C-alpha cells in the first residue's frame, strides 16, 4: 500500500511539473540586480557555441544514472561514512522536468558561468553545477555523465565535519562545492541538460544540473542526527538511510 501511495505521489508531482512549465512566464519572475532569467525569451544558441551546436536529449537511462549516483552518495554519507556526521532527515532526490528544462536553456549559452538567474515559482534559490568537457571527440553521453559525477565524488577527500556544520565551498584540501551541493538535505530534486558543439578542431560539451536548493555560507549542509534518518516520517525502501521521496521537505527553508 505504501509503495502504491508513493507511486501516486510521484506521478502527481510529475504532472504538476509539466503543467507548471507550460504556465510560467519566466520573464516575470524577479531577478536580483540587472540579471535576466535563463528561461526568458527565445531559446537559441549563443555565439560562443561555435559550429554545429546541438542539445542532446537525456534519456531515461541517463536520468536514472544521475539519480542513482546522487542518491548512492547521499545514502552513504547519511549513515556516517567518510568520517562525516550522520544525517537526520536527508531524502531521496527525484528528477524535475522544470529544473531540467532550465538547465538545458543554460547549456545553450555554451558557458559554464553566466549571470542569468534560474529560480522558479517552486524553487526560489536553486543551486547549479556545471561540467565542461573538451577533447578531440566526445564520448557517449553516459561517459560524460560518469566523468562529471567522478569529479564531484573525488571531493570526498576535501570535505569535513566542519564544512558540513558550517558550509564553505573550499576546505583546507580543496574544492567541495559539487559534493556539498549533492549532500544538502534541502535538495529534493535535480534536473540536467547537455549541449555539444565544435570549437575549431576540438569537440566540446557542457553538462548543467540545477538543484532545488543551494548551500548557504556558514549554514549547515544538513542537519546532524544520532542515527541515519531519525527524523524521517518514512524511510526509503532502496536507500535505507534516506527519507522516502514523499518526505515533505521545503527546499526554500534554510537550516
Swiss-Prot record:
- What are the record keywords, sorted? Cell adhesion impairing toxin, Hemostasis impairing toxin, Platelet aggregation inhibiting toxin, Secreted, Signal, Toxin
What SUPFAM superfamilies would the database entry show? PR-1-like
CC annotations in GO = extracellular region
Motif (Cell attachment site) on chain: 32-34
Question: What does UniProt give as the signal peptide span?
Answer: 1-23
Decide whether keyword Cytoplasm is in the record: no
Quote one Gene Ontology molecular function term.
Answer: toxin activity
Q: Please list the residue ranges annotated as the SCP domain.
A: 67-211
Q: Cross-referenced InterPro entries, in alphabetical order?
A: CAP_dom, CAP_sf, P14a_insect
Q: Which Pfam families match?
A: CAP (PF00188)
Q: Which domain of life is it from?
A: Eukaryota
Tissue specificity field: Expressed in salivary glands.
Subcellular location per the Swiss-Prot or TrEMBL entry: Secreted
Its family?
Answer: Belongs to the CRISP family.
Biological function: Inhibits platelet aggregation induced by all agonists tested (ADP, arachidonic acid, the thromboxane A2 analog U46619, thrombin, and snake venom snaclecs (TMVA that activates platelet through GPIB, and stejnulxin that specifically acts through GPVI (GP6))). May act by competing with fibrinogen for binding to glycoprotein IIb/IIIa (ITGA2B/ITGB3).
Q: What protein does this entry describe?
A: Tabinhibitin 2
| Species in which this protein is naturally found | Tabanus yao (Horsefly)
Amino acid at each position: 500500500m505504501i509503495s502504491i501511495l508513493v507511486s501516486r505521489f510521484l506521478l502527481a508531482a510529475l504532472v504538476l511539473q509539466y503543467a507548471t512549465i507550460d504556465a510560467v512566464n519566466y520573464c516575470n519572475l524577479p531577478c536580483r540586480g540587472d540579471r535576466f532569467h535563463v528561461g526568458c525569451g527565445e531559446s537559441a544558441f549563443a555565439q560562443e557555441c561555435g559550429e554545429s551546436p546541438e542539445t542532446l536529449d537525456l534519456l531515461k537511462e541517463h536520468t536514472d544514472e544521475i539519480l542513482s549516483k546522487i542518491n548512492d552518495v547521499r545514502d552513504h554519507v547519511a549513515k556516517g561514512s567518510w568520517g562525516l556526521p550522520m544525517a537526520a532527515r536527508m531524502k531521496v532526490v527525484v528528477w524535475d522536468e522544470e529544473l531540467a528544462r532550465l538547465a538545458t536553456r543554460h547549456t545553450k549559452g555554451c558557458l559554464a558561468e553566466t549571470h542569468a538567474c534560474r529560480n522558479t515559482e517552486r524553487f526560489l534559490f536553486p543551486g547549479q553545477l556545471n561540467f565542461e568537457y573538451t577533447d578531440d571527440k566526445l564520448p557517449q553521453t553516459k561517459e560524460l555523465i560518469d566523468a562529471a559525477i567522478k569529479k564531484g565524488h573525488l571531493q570526498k577527500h576535501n570535505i569535513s565535519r566542519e564544512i558540513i556544520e558550517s558550509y564553505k565551498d573550499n576546505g583546507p584540501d580543496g574544492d567541495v562545492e559539487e559534493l556539498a551541493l549533492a549532500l544538502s538535505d534541502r535538495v529534493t530534486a535535480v534536473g540536467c541538460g547537455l549541449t555539444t558543439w565544435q570549437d575549431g578542431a576540438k569537440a566540446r560539451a557542457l553538462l548543467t544540473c540545477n538543484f532545488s536548493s543551494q548551500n548557504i555560507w556558514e549554514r549547515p549542509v544538513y542537519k546532524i542526527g544520532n542515527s541515519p534518518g531519525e527524523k524521517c516520517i518514512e524511510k526509503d525502501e532502496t536507500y535505507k538511510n534516506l527519507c522516502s521521496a514523499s518526505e515533505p521537505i521545503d527546499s526554500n527553508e534554510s537550516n
